[in-house]
A protein has these predicted regions:
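Alpha-helix C-terminal capping segments
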Residues: 1-8, 34-38, 206
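N-terminal small/polar loop signature for handling phosphorylated ligands or for N-terminal nucleophile
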Residues: 1-11, 127-133, 158
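Glycine/charged-rich beta-loop-alpha catalytic/anionic-binding loops adjacent to active sites
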Residues: 7-18, 182-185
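C-terminal non-catalytic interaction/assembly regions of soluble proteins
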Residues: 146-221
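Short coil/turn connectors at secondary-structure junctions
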Residues: 4-8, 41-45, 51, 76, ...
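Accessory alpha-helical/coil subdomains and C-terminal extensions
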Residues: 56-146
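Short beta-strand segments
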Residues: 10-13, 47-51, 118, 142, ...
Length: 221
């Protein structure tokens, strides 16, 4: 979101220690280099390469604590595969990124403070009241299912002086606007996870505090 280039930016890693039987680090590093040098990788944005798959940074998530196939994009699928030393692509992100992004690290010295509040059944008022009392620059509400917020939490967090975004704890799917959001002053995360919604809101707040414009960022990025 803040690197304005069409050059491939590839992230890789390993799930097994270097001394483990069938360590995955060396092959992941090799394939990451192969992806970076593939001409078709130009303009694809930030890529994550592990276990022979190529994923877009926007949609990828870690799905398992130890499995080498931990990284996946459950909603949109892998962008491609690495085969015979070359990245083969079958889709591309339609969202703005890298050269198409308006966010610039030179525009700010530090990012706004955005916190994440995770909701659950039977949640009492203490935690949400404590979070709101700290007056953050923004708030991400991790709701149940389609970003559903418990009624008592909604009463505490609605129409705050800072932007509040509804997201979901499910790990996949879209959180879309419902009529109650306008009454509560909520934004929605679209298909971003709570963690990624936090990053986008922090960057968005470096440009504007207008709720409509902030919401548009979630539809574009």
């Amino acid at each position: 979101l803040t690197v304005h280039t069409d050059k491939p930016i590839v992230i890789t890693g390993s799930m097994r220690p270097a001394g483990a039987i069938s360590a995955d680090g060396p092959i992941n590093l090799l394939q990451a280099i192969q992806v970076a040098r593939t001409p078709a990788s130009v303009g694809k944005g930030v890529l994550v390469v592990l276990n022979g798959y190529v994923d877009g940074a926007r949609d990828v998530s870690k799905r398992n604590t130890t499995n080498v196939a931990t990284f996946d994009s459950p909603l949109v699928g892998h962008l491609g595969i690495v085969q015979d030393g070359v990245a083969h692509y079958y889709k591309a992100s339609t969202r703005r990124h890298t050269k198409g992004s308006i966010f610039d690290v030179h525009d700010f010295k530090e990012l706004p403070r955005v916190v994440i509040l995770t909701c659950y059944g039977g949640m009492d008022d203490m935690v949400p009241m404590s979070v709101v009392a700290t007056n953050p620059d923004g708030l991400i509400l991790t709701g149940l299912g389609h970003g559903t917020i418990p009624q008592n939490v909604r009463q505490i967090t609605q129409n705050t002086v800072f932007p509040t975004v509804r997201a979901s704890r499910t790990g996949s799917g879209m959180v879309s606007a419902v009529p109650q959001d306008a009454l509560a002053g909520y934004l929605v995360s679209d298909t971003l996870s709570p963690q990624k919604a936090r990053i986008l809101l922090m960057l968005g707040l470096t440009k504007t505090k207008n709720l409509k414009k902030l919401q548009q960022f979630f539809y574009e990025y």
